[in-house]
Amino acid sequence: MTKTLPKDFIFGGATAAYQAEGATHTDGKGPVAWDKYLEDNYWYTAEPASDFYNRYPVDLKLSEEFGVNGIRISIAWSRIFPTGKGDVNPKGVEYYHNLFAECHKRHVEPFVTLHHFDTPEALHSDGDFLNRENIEHFVNYAEFCFKEFSEVNYWTTFNEIGPIGDGQYLVGKFPPGIQYDLAKVFQSHHNMMVSHARAVKLFKDGGYSGEIGVVHALPTKYPFDANNPDDVRAAELEDIIHNKFILDATYLGKYSDKTMEGVNHILEVNGGELDLREEDFVALDAAKDLNDFLGINYYMSDWMQAFDGETEIIHNGKGEKGSSKYQIKGVGRRKAPVDVPKTDWDWIIFPQGLYDQIMRVKADYPNYKKIYITENGLGYKDEFVDNTVYDDGRIDYVKKHLEVISDAISDGANVKGYFMWSLMDVFSWSNGYEKRYGLFYVDFETQERYPKKSAYWYKKVAETQVIE
């Protein structure tokens, strides 16, 4: 049976400042930790990325032509405050005013994120969000943006608090490149959630127009053997690390007893302790019912198996299928069922996981108001032929995920939009330029844009709301 989506559904495309803009030192932009980290550790940099800094009129014109009526954009904090605090950079402010004006001219609603992995270097090298002083600097930056950019109707505090902490302190593929420190993972997640809560409260108390929420990456976790209690426990613990800890903070304003039991077990096995203060929970509690929306980024699910050995994580950054490894002491290891498809980067393709995650939020956090799927898409080694890409695999991936969103809406979930990652090809943090996601192919040598087959398919779905 052909499935449909509501008439007012947003069909969006997603971007991020550092992954798309380029111009990393242009017009007074301050450095971010990624600048040097990429130079020192990877075979690519974020220059020029997709040159969105200069070519946003082209991308927004394409968006309008192809039925994309929403765009996720992030403000580069260091374009506004080059050192994260202090003096404002007027050229950065002017750039974003111009960008938002172009969005509205093209009838593409901007959903604007304040922090998308790019803390200014001056604050990052001073502990990033492990340093509580940086909570204050973030809230001050947020307040400046709320006042300055009154043309923005949809604000997001953070993009993917979970993967920030994981990338920085667990997997170690984000600066500062620390591995296997679970206490730092939880502490950074907690401090960012406090930052989020304070910004949301400030937004509501200030009477600013528009809506505000947060974007969480929520990969669904399943036991490898649902009949094995140890596998069930492994999935629960993995879910706490990646999903439940931050969801509790968002919508409960505290961590449930079950969540804290899991956190305490993980820290008992792996070492470290947390600094959770009474005033933190006052802030979390004050914001728990103020979130206008939740953004869910969903790409994959994982199956977890009980495991007694030492922690070892190998990140597949080059698309060499089967090269990844993930096992955490006292938690479990990832082991996929043989019949579940994977991408070249070992990301498991499982649309049902998105449905299950949406319905889990609806069931466990009934004070949620609405959901946007703020990222979903397929990373591919696109083959550029005849000035396009025949990306049937991507079309199939997006179609199946849109279908389960339709199912979730039919089953009572309030899902209001979908943003494909990514609008155009961008640079990928730990995979470079080979891993492409865009509706529009970017020739990174010439910066020309070419609509892929998926763009024409997406246009038809956006215009008809019929998924076929």
Swiss-Prot record:
GO CC annotations on file: cytosol
PROSITE patterns attached to this UniProt entry: GLYCOSYL_HYDROL_F1_1 (PS00572), GLYCOSYL_HYDROL_F1_2 (PS00653)
Record-listed D-galactose 6-phosphate binding positions: 19, 116, 159-160, 297, 428-429, 435, 437
Ranges annotated as spanning the membrane: none
Active-site residues annotated for this sequence: 160 (proton donor), 375 (nucleophile)
Source superkingdom: Bacteria
Class of this enzyme: hydrolase
Keywords for the protein's UniProt record, in alphabetical order: Glycosidase, Hydrolase
Any one of the GO BP annotations: lactose catabolic process via tagatose-6-phosphate
EC number: 3.2.1.85
Pathway in which the depicted protein is active: Carbohydrate metabolism; lactose degradation; D-galactose 6-phosphate and beta-D-glucose from lactose 6-phosphate: step 1/1
Signal sequence coordinates: none
One example GO MF annotation: beta-glucosidase activity
Catalytic activity: a 6-phospho-beta-D-galactoside + H2O = D-galactose 6-phosphate + an alcohol
Listed PANTHER family: GLYCOSYL HYDROLASE, LP05116P
Recorded family membership: Belongs to the glycosyl hydrolase 1 family.
Protein name: 6-phospho-beta-galactosidase
Organismal lineage: Bacteria, Bacillati, Bacillota, Bacilli, Lactobacillales
